[in-house]
């Protein structure tokens, strides 16, 4: 089912699809990427402009995410201002490129309040790749979430790819 505000997949649908894509990736020996993203300081948007404006921003992000992924990918709203992208047949560099494109386009979003005030937001993104060391949904989620935390810790509005579980250095842009 879908999130009623953004019309993206909801949290439950996301987890069902993630499990299915992991099984498919293992079965066909294909790559799979997960990108988690969080709108930076989103509470300030709601506090300063009200929840109606916050909802307008979330809807715009939903449309943007749908336009940034292929038809076989999945964009989901996990709750609040947290979103995720499931990217089948996508390697580390491909996932980084998608995440960077999303981050950049979110930064370019402009939403106007009824008073004509322009509201902008930024996003932090963390990505992880299914691998020998990251082989199930829990591990993939932890790896992507760790990368998201790293992006936030490095100042927000950036992409971080977590490859520590596969022995590669973190890549942050």
Regions found by a protein language model. Give the residues of each.
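A short pre-motif secondary-structure segment
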Residues: 74-77
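Short catalytic/binding micro-motifs of nucleotide second-messenger systems
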Residues: 24, 67-72, 104-116, 129, ...
């Amino acid at each position: 089912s879908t999130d009623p505000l953004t019309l993206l997949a909801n949290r439950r649908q996301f987890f069902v699809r993630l499990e299915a894509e992991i099984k498919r990736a293992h079965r066909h020996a294909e790559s799979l990427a997960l990108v988690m993203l969080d709108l930076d300081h989103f509470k300030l948007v709601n506090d300063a402009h009200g929840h109606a404006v916050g909802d307008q921003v979330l809807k715009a992000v939903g449309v943007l995410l749908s336009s940034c992924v292929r038809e076989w990918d999945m964009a989901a709203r996990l709750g609040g201002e947290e979103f995720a992208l499931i990217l089948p047949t996508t390697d580390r560099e491909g996932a980084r490129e998608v995440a960077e494109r999303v981050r950049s386009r979110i930064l370019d979003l402009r939403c106007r309040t009824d008073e004509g005030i322009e509201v902008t937001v930024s996003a932090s993104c963390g990505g992880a790749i299914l691998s020998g060391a990251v082989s199930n949904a829990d591990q993939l989620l932890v790896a992507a979430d760790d990368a998201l935390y790293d992006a936030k810790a490095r100042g927000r509005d950036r992409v971080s790819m977590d490859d520590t579980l596969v022995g590669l250095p973190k890549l942050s842009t």
